[in-house]
Amino acid sequence: MVKCRLRHVNNEVAMSQIFHLAVPAGDLATTVTFYTEVLGCQTGNSEHGRWVDVDFWGNELTLHQSTERLPGVRHDVDMGAVSVPHFGAHMSESDFKDLKQRIEQAEHDYLDPPYRRFKGTEFEQETFFISDPNGNVLEMKTMVNPEVLFKT
């Protein structure tokens, strides 16, 4: 089961570790359904018809009813061109596999299907890109050695 929940330290929510991002959602109900039913996230505080907070793997993602979409471009990186802007989450390998299964069962298309980067190095990871119903791009990933995330 995908764990899309707040992090706890000593039975308390680790508020200083929670990231907040607000994005345009287009049709709010449609986009909330994607985050809850496809990704397995839970909703929190909201203002009916205007915005909804989503527990996005322990981070606060606020979806705003909107008519606009964020413009996107592709940037070249080591494995090809990736969508920018994008946001996402790092997760355990088991949660990552569960999420892939949820996406595939929902028959939701990948923008960039799952692939491995940095094979054979300490930075090896598996990642994929999807978009929500309003075109916001998400990159979800799991690392073989998550402790090296910020290693230089």
Which residue stretches match the model-derived regions?
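N-terminal beta-strand motif that seeds the catalytic metal site of vicinal oxygen chelate
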Residues: K3-A29, F87, M91, T142-T152
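A short, acidic/glycine-rich surface segment
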Residues: R69-H75, P113-T121, V148-L149
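Conserved catalytic-core motifs of GNAT/GCN5-like acyltransferases
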Residues: Q42-H48, Y115-F118, T142-E147
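Vicinal oxygen chelate
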Residues: L28-A29, V82, F87-N134
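Core segments of cupin and vicinal oxygen chelate
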Residues: V23-T67
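Residues that flank catalytic or metal-binding motifs in active/ligand-binding sites
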Residues: Q17, R50, W57-N59, S83-P85, ...
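GNAT/GCN5-related N-acetyltransferase fold signature
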Residues: I130, M140-M143
